[in-house]
Design a protein with these regions (language model features):
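Extracytoplasmic/secreted proteins, especially bacterial periplasmic and envelope-associated proteins
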Residues: 40, 44, 67, 71, ...
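The canonical Cys-X-X-Cys-His
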Residues: 45-57, 112, 134
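Short cysteine/histidine-rich zinc-coordinating motifs and their immediately flanking basic loops
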Residues: 61-67
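Extracytoplasmic electron-transfer domains, predominantly the class I c-type cytochrome c fold
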Residues: 70-120
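Extracytoplasmic/periplasmic C-terminal soluble domains
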Residues: 74-80, 144-151
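C-terminal capping alpha-helices of c-type cytochrome domains
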Residues: 110-111, 118, 122-148
């Protein structure tokens, strides 16, 4: 039996249709309390960080389409596990210091927001001025003499 391009394409389309029935968690749990930051800092953090690092994720249309939906749900889950601005007050001062320092290092090194996020979310791109504002905010909220050993 000869497999034609049309049959392969039809099989692919059917498979793509079938995987849409696999459920994906795109929930946004309640926000416990906003991180204490100025409106200027919030205006930078929200578009650049909150889709992955808060319970205020704005799920784009393509988050409804498998297999992309699986990847997005996983990225958000991992981002919230690592740092969640919506549960900031649960963290001890030591942990907050650790997160602020690590976050700033990742921003300064260009690791956050991730390169693959920016093409579809250009509003998340951080300008020099944005990074300066975040750096000054980070310096102002770091608690002196807090040990970083806590995980």
């Amino acid at each position: 039996m000869k497999i034609t391009f049309a049959k392969v394409l039809l099989g692919f389309i059917l498979l793509l249709g079938l995987i849409q029935i696999i459920p994906v968690d795109r929930s946004n749990p309640p926000v416990e309390e906003e991180i204490a930051a100025s409106s200027e800092v919030q205006a930078i953090l929200k578009p650049a960080c909150y889709d992955c690092h808060s319970n205020e994720t704005i799920w784009p249309w393509y988050s409804q389409v498998a297999p992309v939906s699986w990847l997005l749900a996983w990225d958000v889950h991992e981002g919230r596990e690592e740092l969640n601005f919506s549960t900031w007050n649960r963290y001890s001062p030591k942990k907050r210091n650790k997160y602020i320092k690590e976050s700033w290092e990742e921003v300064e090194e260009g690791e956050m927001p991730p390169w693959f996020y920016l093409p579809l979310h250009p509003e998340a791109s951080l300008s020099y001025q944005d990074r300066t504002v975040l750096r000054e905010w980070a310096k102002s909220v770091l608690t002196p003499n807090e040990d970083e050993d806590e995980d």
